[in-house]
């Protein structure tokens, strides 16, 4: 299998997603938001407002550790991020994709083939696996 390097917008066209192939090395261009269990629960189970215009601002959700620090002026600083296992989000994904328009989910560990067939394929979405711990530092 030959590996391709692909640039993908975080507000991708369906054609760009459909053009991806297994094994592609994908670089994301644009804004990506983090959300894990707490955000999913508040947004979906408690109907909390999402403070972004999704998917206009971004259709890329990174499953990772809480990563932002709120500054006194209300801005945010991003520290280091650590991917978290995406299989834990499966029960929320259909509703999450519908509510947010998410087309790109980034995380670690992948999902089951059933999840891909039930959630990603019907929504024209893609799952991207991150590199392992410490690999980012190794690669520079």
Where are the model-predicted features located?
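Feature captures the catalytic cores and cofactor-binding loops of soluble hydro-lyases/lyases
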Residues: 34-140
